[in-house]
Every structure is written in structure tokens, then in C-alpha cells.
Swiss-Prot record:
InterPro entries (UniProt xref): Ribo_uL30_ferredoxin-like_sf, Ribosomal_uL30_bac-type, Ribosomal_uL30_CS, Ribosomal_uL30_ferredoxin-like
Complexes and interactors: Part of the 50S ribosomal subunit.
NCBIfam families for this protein: rpmD_bact
Entry's Gene Ontology molecular function annotations: structural constituent of ribosome
Family stated for the protein in its record: Belongs to the universal ribosomal protein uL30 family.
Signal peptide location: none
Organism the protein comes from: Salmonella typhimurium (strain LT2 / SGSC1412 / ATCC 700720)
Gene Ontology BP annotations: translation
Name of the protein in its database record: Large ribosomal subunit protein uL30
Top-rank lineage group of the source organism: Bacteria
Amino acid sequence: MAKTIKITQTRSAIGRLPKHKATLLGLGLRRIGHTVEREDTPAVRGMVNAVSFMVKVEE
């Protein structure tokens, strides 16, 4: 089974760049405190890196 990471949204998307809002939706995050589990791939890591100030990552 592929390694997964837990991603939790910690800050609001209100007033953010449209690109950042789209990245959050691409990760499946909809609201503050929402947690999703995603495969640990370079694509997902890149998305997390783009909005790192708005999310928390657990290995």
C-alpha cells in the first residue's frame, strides 16, 4: 500500500488568490479543521507546498 499523509486546513481561504483556493479544492479541503488523507506523491507534495501557510501535514 502506498504511503499516505494527513492534510488539515488550518486557515481560511477567504481573501486568498484564486490559485490557492483551487489548490485547496484540488486537495479536497473545504473548511477550516477539515482533514483528508492523500497518497504521498510529488504532485500532492507540490500542492501542499503551495498552500503550506494554510495547512498542517502529518506523516
